């Protein structure tokens, strides 16, 4: 379940275990939802540049995934990610359209998803950015997508962001034939993801904040 996208489709009363997916799945799903709804995704690849995690070794040692056995704090490590498959459970129309991989890097927090997508409708940088800007400002994804215009944006800047996806609008690329787009989405893989888990937990527990204005 990615809160903001498919949480309303679950039966809270009849479900015993809820999965809030992963930090990467929560980061890419809102943006992919916007692109799929507005431009149509034909196929694509997702590469996540991810802060190292406690699944890796601090010193070279044994690991069931050999590369993850190498020292996390001094190496860039190519590894797998389940986000490419998980996102198709959140957005079923993307099934069999995406591949995904990861590079773990020696930063303690702050990650980046790079999405290279072929779309069915010809587009432009302005159109892509406008679609995501609108979704970040109105609708069901205002707590999920942060539309960022900072030209100096780097990974440290997004730490502590409450949105699960920080869209880097200045990095958007569209190919000359207008059918291939590259999107850069930052995310705080700790705090930003935790906020999504809390949103889902509140929904399941039927905790509501009443706002009067």
What do these predicted ranges mean?
Residues 23, 79, 120, 188-189:
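Structured loop/turn residues at secondary-structure junctions
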């Amino acid at each position: 379940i990615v809160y903001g996208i498919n949480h309303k489709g679950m039966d809270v009363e009849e479900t015993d275990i809820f999965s809030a997916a992963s930090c990467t799945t929560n980061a890419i799903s809102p943006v992919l939802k916007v692109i799929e709804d507005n431009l149509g995704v034909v196929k694509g690849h997702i590469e996540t540049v991810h802060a190292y995690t406690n699944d890796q070794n601090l010193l070279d040692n044994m690991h069931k995934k050999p590369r993850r056995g190498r020292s996390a704090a001094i190496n860039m490590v190519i590894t797998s990610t389940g986000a490419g498959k998980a996102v198709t459970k959140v957005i079923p129309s993307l099934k069999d359209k995406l591949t995904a991989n990861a590079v773990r890097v020696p930063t303690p927090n702050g990650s980046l998803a790079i999405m290279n997508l072929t779309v069915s409708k010809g587009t432009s940088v302005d159109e892509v950015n406008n679609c995501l800007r609108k979704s970040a400002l109105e609708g069901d994804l205002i707590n999920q997508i942060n539309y960022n215009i900072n030209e100096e944006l780097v990974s440290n800047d997004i730490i502590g962001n409450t949105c699960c996806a920080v869209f880097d609008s200045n990095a958007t690329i569209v190919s000359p034939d207008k059918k291939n787009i590259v999107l850069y989405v930052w995310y705080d893989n700790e705090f930003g993801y935790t906020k999504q888990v809390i949103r889902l937990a509140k929904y399941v527990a039927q905790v509501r904040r009443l706002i009067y204005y």
